[in-house]
């Protein structure tokens, strides 16, 4: 019985860690793409680009905070 409980808890922990790593990689990839988009469009609509990127960043931070509260 103890082996089964340990295996179940360990499997759940591994699942949470892999989900957390996957989400962090998505957030990092989206932040890198947003930074590249901001550099390319800096001359034309910098205020709108900044606002859009800032809004995306805030949403990503909220998602990360929510997921951390669930996973930790």
Curated annotation (Swiss-Prot):
It holds the Pfam family Hormone_2. SMART domains: GLUCA. The modification Asparagine amide is found at residue 72. It is found in: Secreted. The modification Isoleucine amide is found at residue 27. Its main location: secreted. It comes from the Eukaryota. GO terms for cellular component: extracellular region; neuron projection. Keywords: Amidation, Cleavage on pair of basic residues, Hormone, Secreted. PHM-27 is a bioactive form from proteolysis of the same precursor protein, that causes vasodilation. It is a potent agonist of the calcitonin receptor CALCR, with similar efficacy as calcitonin. It comes from Oryctolagus cuniculus (Rabbit). Belongs to the glucagon family. GO terms for biological process: adenylate cyclase-activating G protein-coupled receptor signaling pathway; epinephrine secretion; mRNA stabilization; positive regulation of protein catabolic process; prolactin secretion; regulation of protein localization. InterPro entries: Glucagon_GIP_secretin_VIP, VIP/GHRH-like. This is VIP peptides. PROSITE patterns: GLUCAGON (PS00260). X's at positions 28 to 44 were included by homology with the human precursor sequence. One of its GO terms (molecular function) is neuropeptide hormone activity.
């Amino acid at each position: 019985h103890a082996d089964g409980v340990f295996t179940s808890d360990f499997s759940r922990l591994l699942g949470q860690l892999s989900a957390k790593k996957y989400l962090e990689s998505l957030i990092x990839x989206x932040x890198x793409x947003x930074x590249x988009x901001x550099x390319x469009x800096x001359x034309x609509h910098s205020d709108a680009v900044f606002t859009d990127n800032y809004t995306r960043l805030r949403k990503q931070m909220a998602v990360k905070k929510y997921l951390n509260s669930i996973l930790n």
